[in-house]
């Protein structure tokens, strides 16, 4: 298990490092402050499972003085609320779902057991992962960093496209900004997609 956790942490570290390299390459990052970059890449609250922040936004925030009352109202109190929500999701709801639903599903081959397990595990995965994300974001707030939220009521989505934009938001936006959009723009410049006659 620790090996898997370590691998996940390395993957999120890689997302941050790749983002910096891409933005240096395309000129979005004009100057580099090594200590700020290292702090961004190794920022511990969100290191193991996100959310994936953006280096320029992160650097701007850590270098901006926060007035005491603003910190209390916009960072400290919201941070504790998010941590409380994370504890509720991860250690109460997810635990109950696993103990009394996921672990009780019989490993029978059949459509009903499969559907039952699918719903049980999906809900468990959401509350477990969203709970961790709330803990990470809340801790980030307390450290003076408005880390992005990772979930936005995904089960209220009208279709799979909307679901993808509400589930693990920071990861889907990362892929959109640093892989998909760049691939499309590069393909248009090189005319990879030719119009059919």
PLM regions with names:
Residues 1-197:
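Membrane-embedded transmembrane alpha-helical bundles that form the catalytic cores
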């Amino acid at each position: 298990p620790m090996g898997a956790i370590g691998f996940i942490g390395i993957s999120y570290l890689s997302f941050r490092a790749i983002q910096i390299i891409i933005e240096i390459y395309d000129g979005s990052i004009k100057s580099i402050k090594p200590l700020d970059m290292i702090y961004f890449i190794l920022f511990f609250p969100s290191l193991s499972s996100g959310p994936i922040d953006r280096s320029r936004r992160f650097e701007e925030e850590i270098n901006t003085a926060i007035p005491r009352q603003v910190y209390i109202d916009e960072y400290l109190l919201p941070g504790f609320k998010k941590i409380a929500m994370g504890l509720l999701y991860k250690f109460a709801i997810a635990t109950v779902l696993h103990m009394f639903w996921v672990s009780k599903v019989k490993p029978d081959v059949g459509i009903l057991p499969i559907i039952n397990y699918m719903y049980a595990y999906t809900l468990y995965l959401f509350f477990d992962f969203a709970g961790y994300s709330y803990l990470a974001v809340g801790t980030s707030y307390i450290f003076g960093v408005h880390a992005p939220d990772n979930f936005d009521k995904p089960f209220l989505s009208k279709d799979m496209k909307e679901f993808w934009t509400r589930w693990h938001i920071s990861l889907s936006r990362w892929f959109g900004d640093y892989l998909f959009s760049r691939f499309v723009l590069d393909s248009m410049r090189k005319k990879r997609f030719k119009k059919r006659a």
